UniProtKB/Swiss-Prot annotation:
Substitution effect: N567A: Complete loss of N-degron binding
Keyword terms, alphabetized: Cytoplasm, Host-virus interaction, Leucine-rich repeat, Repeat, Ubl conjugation, Ubl conjugation pathway
One GO term of the biological process aspect: positive regulation of proteasomal ubiquitin-dependent protein catabolic process
Location relative to the cell: Cytoplasm
Protein name in UniProt: Protein zyg-11 homolog B
Organism phylogeny: Eukaryota, Metazoa, Chordata, Craniata, Vertebrata
PANTHER family the UniProt entry points to: PROTEIN ZYG-11 HOMOLOG B, PTHR12904
Gene that specifies this protein: ZYG11B
Organism: Homo sapiens
């Protein structure tokens, strides 16, 4: 692995620096640290002065997160922030705000790529030119993808920046006259005029004794002949870098003609002819051998780069498509050029199809391409396919969490931007359907669940349906009850999932799609009364009775169905909906199942329904008494399960059952359930039980004179476990409970 790529991979695997953590916190909580001026702009409340490097980093961080506007840039007024290298990419600011916030600083670099149309290049240079120090000392200026001026004719003003050494002005309506002005700058050494409106580059002769780097990618308006272009280039004897690459749109032979020249560009160390026609390995090799100092050649989207001489794995770097090294170099160098990013990703996909080794350094390059071109469908399509290949199965386990968080965010953005493109949605779902990502990686799970549900509501692809419900089943367990309720209300999620269950039941089909759908419904209804009501209102109870009757020997199906019905039974307002004789009869028969997982959940339903007293029981009183006896005896017969059968968000649904001293079977089920999870996962559940006040409930059972001996025995055992936990770990402080996925 190249040293720089290895370093990037190590950076992703390392914790965030303290400075990055502080700056990210500051940028996301600006309102806490700032007050507003009378004009509405922000200023920092603390009077201290930021070091220059920190001020630069803060500005770059705000730009990265899209937070720069007329209000927020106010913090860079005055002298608290001392900027030197300013990045305001994609800022949404006015010319007045720019001048007030940035033009009094001693800037040596400014990157204003893609700032909004309210501010023009003329505005920026006029502002910078108002500061004499900047006029003489600004060295690097990036003005890509901007409007030159809103006036016609407009005042040319580049000459004010007499100290400028490097200028990038790509994707701009920049003409020959403008080039002539720029070429006259006395210190100019580096110029990027890619994709501008220039028709003639003869003006470059004015800086032939200074120019060391010239980038002319995709000069689509150029009207010079190849000979005329080469005559100008030949005069630029001090060039170290030349880029004449193109997007494969022209058939010009300029690249081959240049490569055949022997008396040209003697100091060249970097040449880019990517996307050009007629380029051959033989011509490239001959050109490089005549210039032994060459360090880079760009050959992506050409017919060259396949010889041993041009592998790119030695001193000579090569961007191309022949191997992984060349492709990585292309992704690194062309991250701002959508066409080349797509080309590189297309070839990367073929290489990664059979990848067996984790490649975080490659994934990071894919992420950069995705982030830079969020609305470019071909890029997002190719990138999402590569992401799947790079993170599938065990490969994700070796990827840094930070990197996976970035890529997950970008996958969700792609789904949001292109909701109707089936292949893109499929690529994203394939990548998201990963235990590593869904369980370990931080991302907005609520938004993810919404996007996946929207896809599920609009598509019927069977394979993708399985993945979508699998993703939802895990995401649902990670959401708060408020979020699951909102999800159900906004997207009719319960109705859609029930439709899948109905379809599978009608087909008498037990497959992974059915199991994942049942799991999703189970998790969505967990401690969510609103979602439980949606389930009842959409005839879920009748459908689930059919499922139980249709698959009497499928214990995994029965467990999921009964688990959800437990959630319904926990909701007191829905108690009457379950007072249905056929339903109670069927549940009571499952109480005697030989499968402890099935019997356990059947018992839970009965325990909740009986716990509300005789008045709430609207069926036969003798049946209630019989169920109580059966409940008690069934629980005593259960063997100790080898693994954790279930996971709970909290113990709150159990506490009402613990006070049912007149119905010991109800208490017995509750303490058995609590002991089960506390013994299988003590670090989670012992802490949870203590935090939620479970100790007092258990002491009440232990000390009550009418407590059933079996109930008391289990309660004492739980208390013993809790006391040992406190001795080992201390009494846990109150904390937010993290929802956990059920173990299905």
């Amino acid at each position: 692995m190249p040293e720089d790529q290895a370093g990037a991979a190590m950076e992703e695997a390392s914790p965030y620096s303290l400075l990055d953590i502080c700056l990210n916190f500051l940028t996301t909580h600006l309102e806490k640290f700032c007050s507003a001026r009378q004009d509405g702009t922000l200023c920092l409340q603390e009077p201290g002065v930021f070091p220059q490097e920190v001020a630069d980093r803060l500005l770059r961080t705000m730009a990265f997160h899209g937070l720069l506007n007329d209000g927020t840039v106010g913090i860079f007024r005055g002298n608290q922030m001392r900027l030197k290298r300013a990045c305001i990419r994609k800022a949404k600011i006015s010319a007045v705000a720019f001048r007030k916030a940035f033009c009094h600083h001693k800037l040596v670099e400014l990157d204003a790529t893609g700032v909004n149309a309210d501010i023009t290049i003329t505005d920026i240079i006029s502002g910078l030119g108002s500061n004499k120090w900047i006029q003489q000392n600004l060295q690097c200026l990036v003005l890509n993808s901007l409007t030159l001026s809103l006036e016609d004719p407009y005042e040319r003003c580049f000459s004010r920046l007499s100290g400028l050494r490097a200028l990038s002005i790509t994707n701009v309506l920049f003409y020959n006259e403008d080039l002539a002005e720029v070429a006259s700058l006395p210190r100019l050494e580096s110029l990027d005029i890619s994709n501008t409106s220039i028709t003639d580059i003869t003006a470059l002769l004015a800086c032939k004794d200074r120019l060391k780097s010239l980038t002319m990618h995709h000069l689509k308006c150029l009207k010079m002949t190849t000979t005329q272009i080469l005559d100008v280039v030949r005069e630029l004897k001090h060039l170290n870098h030349l880029d004449i690459s193109d997007d494969k749109q022209f058939t010009s032979d300029i690249a081959l003609r240049l490569l055949e020249q022997k008396d040209i560009l003697p100091n060249l160390v970097s040449l880019d002819v990517s996307g050009r026609k007629h380029v051959t390995d033989k011509a490239v090799e001959a050109f490089i051998q005549q210039r032994p100092s060459m360090q880079f050649v760009g050959l992506l989207a050409t017919d060259a780069g396949y010889s041993e001489f041009l592998t790119g794995e030695g001193h000579l770097k090569v961007s191309g498509e022949a191997n992984e090294t060349q492709i990585a170099e292309a992704l690194k160098r062309y991250s701002e050029r959508a066409f080349f990013v797509r080309e590189a990703l297309f070839h990367l996909f073929s290489l990664t199809h059979v990848m067996e080794k984790t490649k975080p350094e490659i994934l990071k390059l894919v992420v950069t391409g995705m982030r830079n071109h969020p609305m470019n469908l071909p890029v997002q399509l190719a990138a999402s396919a590569c992401v799947f290949n790079l993170t599938k199965q065990d490969l994700a386990a070796g990827m840094p969490v930070r990197l996976l968080a970035d890529v997950t965010h970008l996958l969700l953005k792609a789904m949001e931007h292109f909701p109707n493109h089936q292949q893109l949605q499929k690529n994203c779902l394939l990548s998201l359907c990963s235990d590593r990502i869904l369980q370990d990686v931080p991302f907005n799970r609520f938004e993810a669940a919404k996007l996946v549900m929207q896809w599920l509501c609009n598509h019927e692809d069977q394979n993708m349906q399985r993945m979508a419900v699998a993703i939802i089943s895990i995401l649902a367990a990670k959401l708060s009850t408020e979020q699951t309720a909102q999800l159900g209300t906004e997207l009719f999620i319960v109705r859609q999932l029930l439709q899948i269950v109905k379809q599978k039941t009608n087909q008498n089909s037990v497959d992974t799609t059915l199991k994942f759908t049942l799991s999703a419904l189970w998790n969505l209804t967990d401690e969510s009364p609103t979602t439980c009501r949606h389930f009842i209102e959409n005839q879920g109870l009748e459908l689930f009775m059919r499922v139980l009757e249709s698959f009497p020997t499928e214990s995994s199906i029965q467990q999921k169905v009964l688990g959800l019905l437990n959630n319904i039974a926990e909701v007191q307002e829905l108690h009457s909906e379950l007072m249905w004789k056929d339903f109670i009869d069927h549940i009571s028969s499952l109480l005697h199942s030989v499968e402890v997982e099935v019997s356990y959940f059947a018992a839970g339903i009965i325990a909740h329904l009986i716990s509300r007293g005789e008045q709430a029981w609207t069926l036969s009183r003798s049946q209630r008494n019989s169920l109580l006896d059966d409940l008690h005896s069934a629980i005593l017969k259960w063997p100790t399960p080898e693994c954790e059968m279930v996971a709970y968000r909290s113990f709150n649904p159990f506490f009402p059952l613990l006070g049912c001293f007149t119905t010991p079977g109800v208490q017995l089920w509750a303490v058995w359930a609590m002991q089960h999870v506390c013994s299988k996962n003590p670090s989670r559940y012992c802490s949870m039980l203590i935090e939620e006040g479970g100790l007092q409930h258990l002491y009440n059972i232990k000390d009550h004179e009418h407590t059933d001996p079996h109930v008391q025995q289990i309660a004492v055992a739980i208390l013993d476990s809790l006391e040992k936990h406190i001795v080992r770990h201390g009494r846990p402080p109150p904390c937010k409970k993290q929802p956990q996925a059920r173990l299905n």
